Amino acid sequence: MVADNIDAGVAIAVADQSSSPVGDKVELPAGNYILVGVDIDTTGRRLMDEIVQLAAYTPTDHFEQYIMPYMNLNPAARQRHQVRVISIGFYRMLKSMQTYKIIKSKSEIAALKDFLNWLEQLKTKAGPSSDGIVLIYHEERKFIPYMILESLKKYGLLERFTASVKSFANSINLAKASIGDANIKNYSLRKLSKILSTTKEEDAACSASTSGSGSGLGSGSSMVSDSVSISPRDSTVTNGDDKQSSKNAVQGKRELFDGNASVRAKLAFDVALQLSNSDGKPEPKSSEALENMFNAIRPFAKLVVSDVLELDIQIENLERQNSFRPVFLNYFKTTLYHRVRAVKFRIVLAENGFDLNTLSAIWAEKNIEGLDIALQSIGRLKSKDKAELLELLDSYFDPKKTTVKPVVKGNSNNNNNYRRRNRRGGRQSVKDARPSSSPSASTEFGAGGDKSRSVSSLPDSTTKTPSPNKPRMHRKRNSRQSLGATPNGLKVAAEISSSGVSELNNSAPPAVTISPVVAQPSPTPVAITASN
């Protein structure tokens, strides 16, 4: 699917880089191994993404743990796994988009240590005769082993992991070899489980019909007596059981969500078990069924050491691939089609050992002829793709030329729809230009609503609605200085007094006259004579 290969609009999927084995294939030696189904949920399909859920399954035990990632899930991963990251205050946590509940999670190193403890316990329970564990996964393009090994290398837990786990095995190769139907294009777990369930039902129906035809003549009376002995009370109980079973079936369908890693781990184990025991009904706990399963999947199992070497090569290819980002910058700014083509070109160049510095040296020595010779050695590209890539690289390295931009083809239907929408939008804008006095029209712009309309077209607090075509004149407030300084101050005051708004202020209070204070003469000093 494109959603799985495109990560946030730019596809840099590690799973798309190379699904072919690198180097000589190291087969798993014969021995007594424990088969475990494994799967993961991640924040994306890149090697730099993180694991969100790690799950493993055996018929006797299972492991499941959610991991709190540092980055958020991209839209494709959120849609597939139905899990998203939320922030409450200073805390980040996982929340299910199905149940709307908070999911208990751990850090990546704590979850990996728990997973290693669980694997070591499985090996200990099997006894000293056990040679190790084989992890079975199911996917079209190899991605799960790379993510698990990269996480283990990050925390220095790879040696402890290789002490218990000896090999990874992809069950999709077993499905292609067992079914071999050219009409089946998608070997997903959901598709294979449906195919295997239908074949099992057909086999059960055939066996029931043959047994019924052989024993129906001799036991017909007993069958009739059994059918007659059923009472109405028993039938009501049966109906209740049917209702309960249907309810449980609906609940089971809700729980069997293939976007969950624990469900896919169990499906991977069950599908491999049924494919390897197609002759009879497989019993998961029987040693014979598990032995048949190991013998069937052993040709497709590889040692962990070879997967580690492949991971190192994938990291080198990823570095080469990222070096071409400036060349395809215009491709990533256009449509999804050109982004996918840019990813394809980058992957092919990186897998053939080219990086930006290597091609730059070739162009500096032999110009476009050297680039043409280098691209001719790539057999995966068509002649049209080689011509497009050659023109793009030459325009990038040549300073006299401008970098080629991809041509986006226009669609006539889209143009017609665009004109139709514009025509409708013009009519609607004319209708919207009419003033509306309804309260709903004035409240739809509140609380950060539609801000496309200008503020001048909104009605003010006055009773008179301004005309949309005539701008509203704002009257300046007259201060005391402007009233005394300008000669129009008396005129404005006269206009205001003549209006009916200020009729109550026409009668002024009588003026109060204050008489000036007359200074009283100061008294003259009187001489007092003393008498005997």
UniProtKB/Swiss-Prot annotation:
Region annotated Disordered, chain positions: 206-251, 403-491
Modified residues (Phosphoserine): S467
Subcellular location: Cytoplasm, Cytoplasmic ribonucleoprotein granule
GO biological process assignments: anterior/posterior axis specification, embryo; bicoid mRNA localization; embryonic development via the syncytial blastoderm; mRNA splicing, via spliceosome; ovarian nurse cell to oocyte transport; pole plasm oskar mRNA localization; regulation of pole plasm oskar mRNA localization; spermatogenesis
InterPro entries: Exu, Exu_RNase_H-like, RNaseH_sf, SAM_Exu
Keyword RNA-binding: yes
Bias kind Low complexity: ranges: 220-231, 404-417
Subunit structure: Component of the osk RNP complex, which is composed of at least exuperantia (exu), ypsilon schachtel (yps), aret (bruno), cup, and the mRNA of osk. In the sponge body, forms a ribonucleoprotein complex (RNP) containing at least me31B, exu, yps and the mRNA of osk; interactions with exu and yps are RNA dependent.
Protein name: Maternal protein exuperantia
Organism whose genome encodes this protein: Drosophila melanogaster
